[in-house]
């Protein structure tokens, strides 16, 4: 009886995942055209499809590629995308493995989702869609780490690298706590043969399940997202974008820092900026009154700033620092004040 119940528990989530994704999988047969809007799956290989939402650019206008934060899907970008599309900017959103509609298609996620695989999927997606490079990337948090990894692997394909509160290295508090637990476990159970990686992932799993639902309630929107989020963290936790900065192209990096970020401190992002070669620095903006997920907290302001980058505003390619005030609709640098999109 016990084994029967266990088999049911294993079978149920797999069945639910299949039913969640069945409607979307039909969209994969639709042909993608860079001149037309598109919502659906794009086939990268017989075993791999990614969900895409695409709005084509107006004539002679650029396209921007948005890369999801850790708990994001294409949906969370809506308020940020609207102002860009209204100005004629083309926008490509997609759900990588472990996120959004792509997660539902392949759920449950039972193995680490390696950041290197996500980078290659993005490269293959851009090839498949035949969107011409070099590309404009906007990556939030986890997506910032992915974008930085893409710039390291394919620097010649990057035009603008806009990193919003990006993952630059493991979070020090979490990392130190887990390492302390590993040390304590070694003292209490000296004969146990678990590797450091196995113990690290064990305690990381506990942190994700115990704290993420309270911090990010959206993580409970479907039965698979919490475990998938752990698998995403598991796959990026050893990455150190702060060590990859030498590959960033000239005047490509635009760093966006939320002053009230609850996850990544300003000091950590300043440390990242300091590691970037001066020739690669384009702009750094500190956004006052914004929390970590700035495209939801201040979507009009962030969209305006990204629009100015995409349109090549020369002031934003001099490596200068800016202070942004979304609710005043202003950006300041020294004695200069620039009027921008107001919240």
Show the residue positions of the predicted features.
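Conserved HGGG/HGGXW glycine-rich cap/lid loop of the alpha/beta-hydrolase fold
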Residues: 55-103
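Active-site loop/oxyanion-hole signature of alpha/beta-hydrolase fold enzymes
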Residues: 96-135
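Gly/Ala-rich beta-loop-alpha elbow adjacent to hydrolase catalytic centers
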Residues: 139-143, 147
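Flexible "cap/lid" loop of the alpha/beta hydrolase fold
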Residues: 152, 161-189
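Conserved alpha/beta-hydrolase catalytic His-Asp/Glu region
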Residues: 173, 192-247
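Short beta-strand/loop motif that positions the catalytic acidic residue
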Residues: 248-249, 255-257
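Conserved loop-alpha-helix segment in the C-terminal half of the alpha/beta-hydrolase fold
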Residues: 256-289
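Catalytic active-site module of serine/aspartate enzymes centered on a nucleophile-bearing elbow/loop
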Residues: 280-343
